[in-house]
Regions:
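A charged, aromatic-enriched C-terminal amphipathic alpha-helix characteristic of glycosyltransferases
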Residues: 7-12, 251, 255, 272-308
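Conserved donor-binding/catalytic core segment of Leloir-type glycosyltransferases
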Residues: 114-131, 136-139, 150
Length: 312
């Protein structure tokens, strides 16, 4: 059965917000996510635009370009410093009414340390236009027989309507994934399934060619203690800090695929080393400590309390 309703990062984070912040406090504000005025502005409550989309997306760029619109919201909340800087530089948004509260994680089990000679399992759980073609190109070049990659890539994460309109564009990529001997194409699974199974993997590989404003799949993989390989495109370097192996983004995708193949092989050769084990322990602790929703929820609580009191 096709997933009926969108359940991407925006929806997941909103669910966490309602889980970790008191509903009575949330009832004092109106939060609109990403697309301005997709829900009407409230006449009396504090209006907050929680911005997670990129500055250049067509469904919001014209609204932000018109500075008369900026006064409509009491506060703008951005999911990364990268996102805030892009909106500030491109649109001159009100700096005194802007805050950064990053996305968070919840309920991530850590994987066991990899031991030499074990199978090496890679997970890729990103939508197909964000780099699946690069990943498949890289996997064709990977020769280590221990390495396999499970691909959970589909447009279904954004609901039935989006899936029916768009998924056929990527059938060729899905078919290619199914043909590769070291790739298992699985398709859509809900985030709850991904989180429950992350600890069974050793590596997360995301050759992103999409300007992420944050990256929840990277953060969850870091928390699970997976060795992460990604580009430095968009806000990925902010999400990952110093922990992933970063392959510098380039528009020559053939070169990028070759570099990712080399990165995967190099990482696989060192996964068993104590230094890498310690690195991944530190990575997991960092992600859990700074991005757990118990901490993120506290940031939201304090922000909303202040915003409500300021309007009284």
């Amino acid at each position: 059965m096709i997933n009926q309703n969108p359940k991407g990062g925006t929806e997941l984070q909103f669910d966490y917000l309602t889980k970790y912040v008191d509903n009575k406090l949330l009832s004092e504000v109106q939060i609109c996510t990403s697309v301005p005025e997709k829900i009407p502005l409230h006449p009396t409550k504090v209006n907050i635009l929680w911005q997670k989309n990129s500055y250049d997306q067509s469904n919001l760029y014209p609204w932000f370009k018109n500075k008369d619109n900026h006064k409509k919201y009491d506060w703008y909340v951005f999911n990364s410093h990268w996102t805030y800087e892009k909106f500030r530089n491109h649109f001159g948004i009100p700096e005194d009414r802007s805050v950064v509260i990053k996305n968070g994680i919840d309920g991530i089990q850590k994987s066991a340390s990899y031991q030499k000679g074990q199978p090496i399992k890679i997970i890729h759980q990103n939508t197909p236009w964000r780099g699946l073609s690069i990943l498949l190109g890289a996997m064709q070049l990977v020769k280590n027989p221990l390495i396999t990659c499970d691909v959970y890539s589909s447009t279904e994460v954004y609901g039935k309507n989006f899936y029916e309109k768009n998924d056929h564009h990527y059938k060729g990529l899905y078919d290619q994934a199914k043909r590769l001997p070291n790739v298992n194409y699985i398709g859509y699974k809900p985030n709850s399934y991904i989180k429950d199974n992350l600890h069974k993997y050793n590596m997360y590989v995301y050759p992103s060619i999409f300007e992420e404003t944050f990256c929840i799949s990277l953060l969850e993989s870091m928390a699970a203690g997976l060795y992460c390989i990604t580009t430095n495109y968009g806000a990925l370097f902010e999400t990952g800090a110093e922990f992933p192996m970063y392959i510098p983004y380039e528009s020559n995708y053939r070169n990028l695929a070759q570099k990712f193949a080399m990165g995967i092989e190099a990482a696989a050769n060192t996964l068993h080393e104590e230094q890498i084990h310690n690195h991944l322990e530190c990575q997991s602790a960092y992600a859990q400590a700074y991005y757990g929703w118990n901490k993120i929820g506290t940031s939201w609580k304090r922000f909303i309390e202040g915003a409500v009191n300021a309007k009284k």
